[in-house]
Amino acid sequence: MAKKTILDLRDEDLKGKRVLVRVDFNVPLKNGVITDDRRIREALPTIKYLMDKGAKVILVSHLGRPKGFQDDLRLDPVAKRLSELLGKPVKKLNDCIGEEVEREISNMKEGDVILLENIRFYKEEEANDPEFAKKLASLADLYVNDAFGTAHRAHASTAGVAQYIPGVAGLLMKKEIEIMGKALESPERPFICILGGAKVSDKIGVIKNLMNKVDGFLIGGGMMFTFLKALGYEIGKSIVEEDKLDLAREIMNMAKERGIQFLLPKDAVVVKEIKEDAPTSIKDIDKFEKDDIGVDIGPKTIELFREEILKAKTIIWNGPMGIFEIPAFANGTRKIAEAIAENRNCVSIVGGGDSAAAIQTLGLEDKFTHISTGGGASLEFLEGKELPGVAVLQDK
């Protein structure tokens, strides 16, 4: 990795120093209880490393999309869970800046951990307000960005603070960038990219950037219907982006010219209306009627994709194969996850978001090389964009 990480620092750079760590503790809550603590667990290596080196660790994160101060989005449940995981009390403050915060930090001992309040309670955070960033930076001697999930945002706590104090990457940030970077730069082949989700428009950048790198694309999810319609198929009332049909044709032609496989589904699970208990049927894609709605890939497609998955040496997967929130339409996503898990000879990378959620639901996390903690950030990374939260860190 071209950026400095905490591993590049000498012990004296950390011992007794105040270190502001941007983490991504944006975890799902139900009635004030954390339903999935993965993001907290992913941050532990960085936090423990800094504690062991005698740093005073000041954690900052957002949670949800608050409108000003909101009691139900305070970080108290996170501090409680983090304390349990570290086996050490984590003091949670009721603010991010100000006298009380400064006083608490001045009382910290080496190896102590403090969690500041939800940074998005301040609108200055998302505006990347320089004065606000300066106040945050004044709390510490060093900045560590370990929040890959927000690295694509230029906010005060993800980018702004690094204008005032030296910034380096944490261990999770390092892992994310190195694993995905290696897959893009020197993949073992065959290298396939599996894309799903509702919209082609969300994945255009990824397709274009990976067009020169992969051996094949496997396309599922709602976006498949834009490609199928572009080829002249009747898709009934399935989701389609009418304004992206020309672009879909252009992408398919580009793949053809370069000899890159571009696999579209052969069949789909079809309903007349999208609801939990809707009667389903399976249809080949050339048999759709005017009132059919495609909601998942069908068994022939699953088998076709599975064959390609089992041959692959590098796999990047982003986006579900159907409307997987509804159990009856989740089979395609489940079977693709199982096929990737079955291939023990490949590097498998899942780009956060819905695909990651599906894998967790299936309990297959340990069968994948890497499940990214960032949905939007991993997409932008795969698009070849420089992430603002990484760009501001010191070069090696």
UniProtKB/Swiss-Prot annotation:
Pfam families: PGK (PF00162). GO terms for biological process: gluconeogenesis; glycolytic process. Substrate binds at residues 24-26, 39, 62-65, 120, 153. Its EC number is 2.7.2.3. It catalyses: (2R)-3-phosphoglycerate + ATP = (2R)-3-phospho-glyceroyl phosphate + ADP. InterPro entries: Phosphoglycerate_kinase (IPR001576), Phosphoglycerate_kinase_CS (IPR015911), Phosphoglycerate_kinase_N (IPR015824), Phosphoglycerate_kinase_sf (IPR036043). Its main location: cytoplasm. It is found in: Cytoplasm. This is Phosphoglycerate kinase. It comes from Dictyoglomus turgidum (strain DSM 6724 / Z-1310).
